[in-house]
Each structure stands twice: as structure tokens, then as C-alpha cells.
Amino acid sequence: CLLIIVPFLYTELSMSKKILGSIIVILIIAVGFYYQSQLSDDDGVKKVGFIYVGPVTDFGWTYEHDQGRKAVVEAFGDAVETTYVESVSEGPDAERAITQMARDHDLIFTTSFGYMNPTIKVAEKFKKVKFEHATGYQRADNVATYAARFYEGRHLIGLIAGGMTQSNTIGYIASFPIPEVIRGINAAYLAATSVNPTVEFKIVWVYTWFDPGKEADAAKALIDQGADIIMQHTGSAAAMTTAEE
């Protein structure tokens, strides 16, 4: 079992990093467009802020966003100044953090789906500040959204999983039942069944983006249910660590 789980999980991490790497490109382009649009207004340093749902050391979603922030600094040099706040929970804490940042920033990236409503609410109060919200669907005159085709990577992972599984059971650790996550599950499942029509997916919802304890417990539960391959749509490496045990 472990011989199958561990290599696959590292394969998933590697492929996910390639997909998440597109975030770096998105951030650079977004800042570039913003900077060019503001050149006629003044030539001062633009302050760009980032609100993160997890720690920058999670080696996942937040880590890649912070790599994007660093790439922005490298690309634009002294023309921009960046700041970030990490581990901001979705809800009232997010609104407070975004509001505080909006008081002295020109462009703000709110990097989690659950920041959508707080972003829209704060944007109404700070019309001169531009906002970029990750994976959301609400927009305003000063709020744009960005995303990548993450489901394409999960489709490839599903193909691999469908061909590798020996127990015919694949476990999936899911965060929240929102379109982004459900789309990923569907992509992986459709791909897996295209090469192995009898494969079964078992899903555990953890209702968090980053909680190593819950993710580890979910992985253990899926392994106990016969899964020999584990996928995840969460932010920590806890599932991989559990699979190695």
C-alpha cells in the first residue's frame, strides 16, 4: 500500500507545483497591468499587499503565492513595495485584515475563495484601491478575479491514479464543497474511470484549507477504508507524512 501511496503523493505534489507556478505569472502580469495603468497618475512607489489564508511555509497554495510576491519584487524592483499578512482566517478576521491593508496600499491580492465577500465589502469603502481576488466570481469596478485551470492537473493525476491503484479505491481529501473543489474532484474521477471504469473514489471533507491535524486524520481514515492512493485539495503535507508512516 505505502509503495503506491508515497510515490503518487509526491507525483501529485510535483504536478501541483507546476500548476501553482502559473500563479507567479498571473501575479506578475496583474501587477504589470496595474503599474502601467497608473504611470500617468504619478511615478511613486506602488504598494502591493497580499492576504494569505495559510502560513508562507505551507509548501502549497500560500507558499506559491508568496513566491509570486517575491517574483513581483524581482521583476519591478524599486517601483513596488510588497507586504503580506499570513494565516488570516476567512470571515471577520479577513475583513479586518483587508480593511487595515487597504488604508495604505494601492493593489491588494486576497488569495482565498472565502475572502470573496469581505473583499467586495472592503472594496466598496476604498474605491481608489484595486483588488485581485483568487478563484472568486464576484467583481466590481475595482475588484478583479484570477484563477488557473487547476482541473487540468487533477485530470492528469486522475489518469495516473486510475492506472496505478491496486485496491481500486482512491481517497480524496477535500476542503470545502465549492465549485473550484468539486470541479477538481470531477476532473480526477472522470480521468480515473476513463482508464479504470470500476475504480471507486472515497471523499473526506475537512472544511478547512490548512489544518495538518485534520488532513492527517482524513488520510488515515481513507487508508483504513482501503484507499491505496490519496489525493488532496488542502494546503499542508500532512497527508504525505501520514502515507509514509
Predicted features and spans:
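A residue-level marker of the well-folded mature domains of exported/periplasmic proteins
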Residues: 20, 35-245
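Secretory targeting signatures
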Residues: 1-39
